[in-house]
Amino acid sequence: MPSVKLKENEPFDVALRRFKRSCEKAGVLAEVRRREFYEKPTSVRKRKAAAAVKRHAKKVQRENRKFQRLY
């Protein structure tokens, strides 16, 4: 869990902004949204497989862009 120590004479708004940024970096909100409802193991596998296919397609597309002729 992210924590923020208040510095001397630091406004609350600045500390709150630092806390929000640290939560964002730690992925707290994304984790909460992901765990909000139960997801069946088959759904988890299906989602992860779809993400892997998407990553692979993106990687192939990036590699093809390298070899594209620029004339």
UniProtKB/Swiss-Prot annotation:
Q: Where is the composition biased (Basic residues)?
A: 48-59
Keywords, A to Z, come to: Ribonucleoprotein, Ribosomal protein
Segments of skewed composition (Basic and acidic residues): 60-71
Name the gene for this chain.
rpsU
Please provide, in alphabetical order, the Gene Ontology terms of the cellular component aspect for this entry.
ribonucleoprotein complex; ribosome
| Gene3D superfamilies assigned to the protein according to its UniProt record, in alphabetical order | Ribosomal protein S8
| Family statement drawn from the similarity comment of this UniProt entry | Belongs to the bacterial ribosomal protein bS21 family.
Q: Which InterPro entries match?
A: Ribosomal_bS21 (IPR001911), Ribosomal_bS21_CS (IPR018278), Ribosomal_bS21_sf (IPR038380)
Q: What is this protein called?
A: Small ribosomal subunit protein bS21
Annotated S-S bridges: none
Q: Which GO terms describe its biological process?
A: translation
